[in-house]
Amino acid sequence: MPKAEVILWQYLKGKKINGCKFRRQFGVGPYVVDFYCAEFKLAVELDGDSHFSEDAQKHDIERQEYIEQFGIKFLRFTNKDVYTNVNGVMQTIYEAIV
């Protein structure tokens, strides 16, 4: 698991946000999201450097649109967001589930 995911997982595990149980590496059809809370149908994805090429961004959009078809809300952050502003990331996640 990439370092940013390890850091964010420390904040998400154990129902720390409004009692929401997050799972790591959760499958949705042919795709896997980094973190998922079934109770609130919320996917959280962290993007590393490999996600910024044109092809990768196109793939990410297709993937996100597929996942959203199931009524799943999708939050996307960069690894840098986690490294430099994990509290802001957590606030955004909290606001998505309350």
Regions found by a protein language model. Give the residues of each.
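Nucleic-acid endo/exonuclease domains
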Residues: 1-98
